[in-house]
Amino acid sequence: MQQTGIQFPGPPAQPLKADPKLNLNSNVLAWIQTYNTLPTDKNPSSALAFADKLKFLRAWSDYYGYPVHIGEFGCYLKADPVSRARYYSTFRHAAEQQGLGWAIWDWSANFRYWDKKTGQPMPGMHEALFGKLN
């Protein structure tokens, strides 16, 4: 399976180059440019990309008195396994730090947790979401 080349957190050691055959729109090209050039503390592929949004959800929950459950978050299967696990772990910890419930997207499709071929979680996923396997 060909991987995207995007790692978490950014920036990458080697700049990501957009394939011209993909005809990417200007927003995606701008994202790639910032991903390639901004340091981790300002990178769109870092915890800071979602930390403020999670703080906003916590503030909304406190203000209105309703709990917030993040019904879907995930990382595309074509990201490298180490970055996927790191993203899931970082997002989960950030959500829990704000007292927000969460669920991943999805069980066994393009953002999969479960590997149907092996009958086990995808590499690093169980540890990222629940801690060490026994």
Stretches with model-predicted labels:
Residues M1-N134:
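Substrate-binding clefts and catalytic carboxylate motifs of secreted carbohydrate-active enzymes
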